[in-house]
Amino acid sequence: MSAIAPGLVLLAYLCGSISSAILVCRLAGLPDPRDSGSGNPGATNVLRIGGKGAAVAVLIFDVLKGMLPVWGAWALGLTPFWLGLVAIAACVGHIWPVFFHFRGGKGVATAFGAIAPIGLDLTGVMAGTWLLTILLSGYSSLGAIVSALIAPFYVWWFKPQYTFPVSMLSCLILLRHHDNIQRLWRRQESKIWTREKKKKTPEQK
């Protein structure tokens, strides 16, 4: 199986390079997410500029393009080392997509999809951590950052053989969020439901 492993890594990168945020926005007649809102082609920004339906479509597709390559590689019997490279390649494709001039997103949903095949128990605690952080803080970026920081410890607890590749994924996610970390520190980061609150304010007055 090691002979086909590099090909699967390349395939994962190409899958990751399919930017669902850009494609969904084009199909829905919405602005290019790279030039609107936060400038990030991801589900959160699509939520801001296009609403829940478009955002859900982007989220599902981004998760699947991380999940399916890893599941396929696992079904073919690749070792944890190669599975980790497949997962990282899918996220690298999302972040630096060859089909869209290497201007991609943060890789959070794709990384979650890539980790999901490890097990439902891990998937559950990861999703719970992400959702709870967002509900308590209102910051989508903080949910991603906290989840990325804790993910290696969760994986070490459930499936320790995958700790190293997941740690690499977490480092990649944190590096992509360096601007968000600075804005959070300065209290300049936008909350995920700021737009809805602004819409309600004139009516309340």
Swiss-Prot record:
Topological category with respect to the lipid bilayer: Multi-pass membrane protein
Pfam families registered for this protein in UniProt: G3P_acyltransf (PF02660)
Assembly, per entry: Probably interacts with PlsX.
InterPro entries in the record: G3P_acylTferase_PlsY
GO molecular function term, any single one: acyl-phosphate glycerol-3-phosphate acyltransferase activity
SMART domains: G3P_acyltransf
An example Gene Ontology CC term for this record: plasma membrane
UniProt-listed Enzyme Commission number(s): 2.3.1.275
Organism of this sequence: Klebsiella pneumoniae subsp. pneumoniae (strain ATCC 700721 / MGH 78578)
GO terms of biological process kind: phospholipid biosynthetic process
Cellular compartments annotated: Cell inner membrane
Protein name as catalogued: Glycerol-3-phosphate acyltransferase
Reactions catalysed, as given in the entry: an acyl phosphate + sn-glycerol 3-phosphate = a 1-acyl-sn-glycero-3-phosphate + phosphate
Subcellular location, principal: membrane
Pathway: Lipid metabolism; phospholipid metabolism
Known function: Catalyzes the transfer of an acyl group from acyl-phosphate (acyl-PO(4)) to glycerol-3-phosphate (G3P) to form lysophosphatidic acid (LPA). This enzyme utilizes acyl-phosphate as fatty acyl donor, but not acyl-CoA or acyl-ACP.
Top-tier EC class: transferase
HAMAP family registered for this protein in UniProt: PlsY
NCBIfam families linked: glycerol-3-phosphate 1-O-acyltransferase PlsY
Stated family: Belongs to the PlsY family.
